[in-house]
Amino acid sequence: MVDSVYRTRSLGVAAEGLPDQYADGEAARVWQLYIGDTRSRTAEYKAWLLGLLRQHGCQRVLDVACGTGVDSIMLVEEGFSVTSVDASDKMLKYALKERWNRRHEPAFDKWVIEEANWMTLDKDVPQSAEGGFDAVICLGNSFAHLPDCKGDQSEHRLALKNIASMVRAGGLLVIDHRNYDHILSTGCAPPGKNIYYKSDLTKDVTTSVLIVNNKAHMVTLDYTVQVPGAGQDGSPGLSKFRLSYYPHCLASFTELLQAAFGGKCQHSVLGDFKPYKPGQTYIPCYFIHVLKRTD
């Protein structure tokens, strides 16, 4: 493991198998504060996602990287039937707590939350009688958490195949990643606001790129976040944590996605929620892939 020479995550965070980078609990707690609740989601993101799902008549949604549940909560509140899964039990506890606190609301009482692993997703999430979900979402740069341990991206292919298998015929997969093309060419993230959440706690984010055998192997982001009441006297304190990501470039990730559907899909790419054209002047922070199963 590269952890022996390069620390890829905060101390106490798991490094075996599909890594739970929030396993120490502290990173999960700080991340929950960092991204906030549904009110912290940007209006542009909320309008775009809800509009996309309703445009395609989606009702049953699988969130395969729900984390603390912020997107799933938004969808439940908007009337969607939601199944939420994540590999981190430390993150899921926030979603489970919200469901418990709102259990008297029929929509939240029906909200399904499970711990699941992308590598065994076809076993962890039973197929519905309808043959899959209307939409599967994997947003917030979540898929990039999965490393390439074997060096051949076989884990990525298996995970994407399992995720794609959850989509019914005619259904959607909505998945994103940061603009790693820009990060790898410049060494830093594109300038601009975060398109997903309005956090006022960030003090600094440092980007590092790990090169192995002349190939980009990992990107790490070191977050410095101001946490209310974390100081000894109750004043705001600073918390630091590191997360690592596999740097998926646009062209190669597009090939992986289309292979996951066996080529039987319609595929469009957006840059920060707007149609993306290679060579355009505006440099997006995120690439968002929307795939519609056609078989």
Curated annotation (Swiss-Prot):
Keywords in alphabetical order: Acetylation, Cytoplasm, Disease variant, Folate-binding, Methyltransferase, Phosphoprotein, S-adenosyl-L-methionine, Transferase
EC numbers: 2.1.1.20
Known tissue expression: Expressed only in liver, pancreas, and prostate.
N6-succinyllysine, modified sites: K46, K193, K198, K203
Record-listed Phosphotyrosine modification sites: Y34
SUPFAM superfamilies: S-adenosyl-L-methionine-dependent methyltransferases
InterPro entries according to UniProt: Gly/Sar_N_MeTrfase (IPR014369), Methyltransf_25 (IPR041698), SAM-dependent_MTases_sf (IPR029063)
Any one GO molecular-function label of the UniProt entry: identical protein binding
Cellular component annotations (GO), alphabetically ordered: cytosol
BP term (GO), one: S-adenosylmethionine metabolic process
Disease entry from the Swiss-Prot or TrEMBL record: Glycine N-methyltransferase deficiency: The only clinical abnormalities in patients with this deficiency are mild hepatomegaly and chronic elevation of serum transaminases.
Family statement drawn from the similarity comment of this UniProt entry: Belongs to the class I-like SAM-binding methyltransferase superfamily. Glycine N-methyltransferase family.
Subunit-level organization: Homotetramer.
Physiological role: Catalyzes the methylation of glycine by using S-adenosylmethionine (AdoMet) to form N-methylglycine (sarcosine) with the concomitant production of S-adenosylhomocysteine (AdoHcy), a reaction regulated by the binding of 5-methyltetrahydrofolate. Plays an important role in the regulation of methyl group metabolism by regulating the ratio between S-adenosyl-L-methionine and S-adenosyl-L-homocysteine.
Protein name listed in UniProt: Glycine N-methyltransferase
Species per Swiss-Prot/TrEMBL record: Homo sapiens
